[in-house]
């Protein structure tokens, strides 16, 4: 998740954004017109390139398989596409959502959607402070306020409201950093854990997320997909710092994720479903989906679910981020993890497929294809 190299591939992002600036045909009412993406490094499309932050992915070999940039890094924390990229493509979106902080995030480019996600960001404002700068969820929603005003100017108030309510998808992939880079940070958070129980910490997360989702609803967001927290105790970083073997995971980290996920499901499928008129919330069970991938990785064609494809060798393996000095695996399609924290494009494709077309085991109350067509 962390990056210390401050090279910014602005030209790559600008070229990429202009190349895919076409808006979905007005006659194709089933196609997804716009995708608004909120979250952390799992779906960051390059916002952190424009921040002075330690959380960056703007150096090779990141993006090596991202075809629109011809293999150049764009700020995505993976070798290719993120889950949000893939979902947008499959639902008919004509262009990837442009990063909010990118110079070409204006005018008609906004009509394809905007990506506000930021590596290191969390639900809570204190999360990710170890990276110096990042966009937390509150700031991301603030930025959408600006985008919403631009839509009224571009389309007029009535058309803008219908465009956002009926033909747009709001994806929220956040929460992992609130544990990994807040509650579970070694030494930094130890004192806080003495005074704040897991229950009260999760309560705080849910309270903040509730308000953030309501703010989006008040600005005409109606179709939501919200991912729960994955089994963060099984990522290479956690295995490395806790000196675990390939088959072991960190119990505390996974228990915290499970506790939060239960509260999140109630928030989405009961509370907000009943209180926010005409809103549709899909609960994406990323935890079980990813755990299935980790446990049964061979069944999905992977060689390993514990070793990162791009990593530093030796005693720091599984800790340092992917960068120019990292060792790269020979076959990226055989690794579940790209680096110590993030999945490969191959894993993202499998996860996205389950979210798009899967059953209630992984998406509740229905899949994303159904959500789009409502």
UniProtKB/Swiss-Prot annotation:
GO terms for biological process: lipid catabolic process. One of its GO terms (molecular function) is hydrolase activity, acting on ester bonds. It comes from Arabidopsis thaliana. Residues 1-26 form the signal peptide. The keyword Lyase does not apply. Glycans are attached at residues 104, 125. GO terms for cellular component: extracellular region. Gene3D superfamilies: SGNH hydrolase. InterPro entries: GDSL (IPR001087), GDSL_Est/Lipase (IPR051058), SGNH_hydro_sf (IPR036514), SGNH_plant_lipase-like (IPR035669). The active site is at 41 (nucleophile), 339, 342. Its EC number is 3.1.1.-. It is an enzyme of class 3 (hydrolase). PANTHER family: GDSL ESTERASE_LIPASE, GDSL LIPASE/ACYLHYDROLASE FAMILY PROTEIN (AFU_ORTHOLOGUE AFUA_4G14700). It is found in: Secreted. Belongs to the 'GDSL' lipolytic enzyme family. This is GDSL esterase/lipase At3g50400. The keyword Cytoplasm does not apply.
